[in-house]
């Protein structure tokens, strides 16, 4: 099954690789229009997935990721249109030179070829990934979780109709429909056809892909994100940033999970934090050194467990720990962080610069919410994933991350001497 799917994807990728930007944008425009025109069918399919997920006891955090609403679907269609407006990186000359031999050499961006994406309860990924892959001339094989089966079928059908309407093969965007887990292992070894693999899910999925794949893997998206509140800080501004980072969308991988507070301001800052978090229904998981200052406050407070520092809450829960100084905060982030997104809130330029240099995450913020780690917020359009590794891409993966390059040499019947 996957052998034929891979072969068809590879053949489709050859057609996509030579498309003009105008043609690719036409496909995306038709795709966005069809998503809106078929919204009723897509939302009905999503309702079926939601009902099955609730019946199996899926957590509220994952249910939120699975849910499509009319507003969310409209926003996704608009994201596709935004990809149309982005510059096409394919064909861009990165650098070049005229060599002493007379050879004119240039390094030019080209598509990767075929990209495989494995993901869980995230139906928006189907559309986001397809739009970015098509813009960059890549074919894609999608393997969504069983939780999104009906939604994925409905959206892939719409995407394939858009491709065929524009005279392109439906095999440019394919989905593995079967929930059989053995097919995941088969996909991981489809290196004859698939050029890059991106898993979007939990730590178990990432571990499986790293250990079993014969295809280069880009991992990331697991976000144990921290914010350090420095001794020199504006309380009101800091609380506003913390509120946004934790509350805006707690199920997102860039939401705040652990707050590190300088001990010297804790007696004054933590009561204000408690009031702010209580208003939003956040449960504070307090370290032993923070517990006495939070107990008796308006927020719900429980003692933190050691393992809580290493896991994503993805909910209205927040770890709170006091640290002696910025270096202790950095040590904690190095020990428990996932290299996703971490922030410092401070009025000290020297502290900010020290934090930025020392924290080795894909996105580091000064006086800003970790929620900004997002392809759209970065001006990249919808993202394929957020990479927390250093090769071949890092941070939100937009269009450039879905390309590689080739060397092209021009000569006049030139031979090497």
Swiss-Prot record:
| Record GO terms (molecular function) | glutamate-5-semialdehyde dehydrogenase activity; NADP binding
Q: Which SUPFAM superfamilies match?
A: ALDH-like
What CDD domains does the record tag this protein with?
A: ALDH_F18-19_ProA-GPR
Q: Which reaction does it catalyse?
A: L-glutamate 5-semialdehyde + phosphate + NADP(+) = L-glutamyl 5-phosphate + NADPH + H(+)
Cellular compartment(s): Cytoplasm
Q: In which pathway does it act?
A: Amino-acid biosynthesis; L-proline biosynthesis; L-glutamate 5-semialdehyde from L-glutamate: step 2/2
Keywords, comma-separated and alphabetical = Amino-acid biosynthesis, Cytoplasm, NADP, Oxidoreductase, Proline biosynthesis
Q: Which domain of life is it from?
A: Bacteria
Q: What is its EC number?
A: 1.2.1.41
Entry GO terms, CC: cytoplasm
Q: What is its main location?
A: cytoplasm
A Pfam family per the record: Aldedh
Record's InterPro entries?
Ald_DH/histidinol_DH (IPR016161), Ald_DH_C (IPR016163), Ald_DH_N (IPR016162), Aldehyde_DH_dom (IPR015590), G-glutamylP_reductase_CS (IPR020593), Glu-5-SA_DH (IPR012134), GPR_dom (IPR000965)
Q: Which GO terms describe its biological process?
A: L-proline biosynthetic process
User: What function is annotated for this protein?
Assistant: Catalyzes the NADPH-dependent reduction of L-glutamate 5-phosphate into L-glutamate 5-semialdehyde and phosphate. The product spontaneously undergoes cyclization to form 1-pyrroline-5-carboxylate.
Assigned protein family: Belongs to the gamma-glutamyl phosphate reductase family.
Record protein name field: Gamma-glutamyl phosphate reductase
